[in-house]
């Protein structure tokens, strides 16, 4: 094959993206289909399955008991994200956790602790049996494990994982425990060095978390158009196949907004994003194409967050 033959696929892709940016002929600002179902894992205290487009994520919550109360509230909540075998094309069976998923888990944990559950520590304390409610000195705490399993990965992972985690947290409930001191004659013979034991409160009472906020994530990509237009186009919730085709030409981003429409988190990854970096933080009073594009993205993110939030509240 000569050099001209090697260039043909590149030329075809350039011609393809000149008139079509999405593989499924969907409008650039169209949201992916969203669905949610709770109570899907009987052995978890709270669970949910969420689909965003073709991406499917299952979230389950486990509760453990700590005989002490950590000073850092973030240490009471641990997020984990893993791929199931063959969750995406080209993936090996039983792959090692990728850096992308580890980074995404840290990102998810930060959003939950700082936005959705800023007062998580006060809700996870275990008090003494003789204590006077929440005014008593805590004798232990609950530790929440939020495990997200990606059944199928077609992009928009933060959109799906955050929604699944919120739905699972909202429906989570478990018996409230109290700490009782062990008798003195039993302390020396106890299997552990702890001098307290935890038992269910009488009468029975359930612990249910109260979410302070419902932050929602929206993934999008900014794709440069070919000359003579040479403009930037925003693609909302692109699939993984579309992101792979754009490669480094697209600037993939994630935007998280709360119920008041405030942007609480913004992340860029993937492409160089040179078209955005030059204009973020510039406020000279003049109207620019990138400025209007960013405002349009934020408006659409608020619209999407409102729709998904209503679905989650109705389903939980």
Q: Which sequence ranges carry the predicted segments?
A:
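Polyanion-binding surfaces on beta-sheet-dominated domains and ring/shell assemblies
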Residues: 1-316
């Amino acid at each position: 094959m000569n050099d001209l033959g090697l260039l043909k696929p590149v030329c075809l892709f350039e011609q393809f993206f000149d008139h079509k940016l999405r593989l499924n002929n969907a409008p650039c600002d169209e949201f992916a289909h969203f669905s949610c179902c709770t109570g899907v894992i009987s052995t978890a205290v709270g669970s949910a399955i969420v689909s965003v487009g073709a991406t499917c994520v299952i979230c389950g919550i486990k509760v453990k008991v700590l005989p002490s109360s950590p000073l850092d509230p973030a240490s009471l909540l641990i997020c984990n994200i893993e791929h199931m075998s063959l969750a995406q094309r080209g993936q090996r069976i039983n792959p090692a956790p990728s850096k992308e998923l580890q980074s995404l888990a840290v990102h998810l944990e930060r959003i939950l602790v700082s936005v959705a559950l800023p007062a998580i520590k006060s809700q996870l304390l275990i008090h003494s049996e003789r204590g006077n409610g929440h005014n008593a000195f805590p004798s232990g705490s609950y530790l929440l494990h939020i495990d997200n399993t990606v059944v199928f990965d077609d992009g928009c992972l933060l959109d799906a994982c955050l929604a699944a985690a919120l739905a699972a947290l909202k429906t989570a409930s478990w018996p409230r425990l109290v700490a009782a001191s062990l008798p003195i004659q039993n302390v020396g013979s106890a299997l552990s060095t702890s001098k307290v034991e935890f038992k269910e409160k009488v009468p029975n009472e359930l612990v249910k978390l109260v979410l302070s906020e419902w932050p929602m994530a929206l993934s999008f990509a900014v794709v440069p158009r070919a000359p003579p237009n040479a403009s930037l186009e925003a693609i909302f919730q692109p699939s993984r196949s579309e992101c792979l085709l754009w490669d480094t030409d697209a600037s993939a981003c994630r935007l998280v907004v709360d119920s008041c429409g405030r942007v609480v988190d913004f992340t860029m990854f993937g492409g160089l994003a040179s078209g955005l970096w030059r204009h973020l933080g510039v406020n000279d009073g003049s109207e620019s194409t990138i400025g209007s594009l960013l405002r349009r993205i934020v408006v659409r993110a608020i619209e999407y967050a409102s729709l998904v939030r209503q679905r989650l509240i109705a389903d939980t």
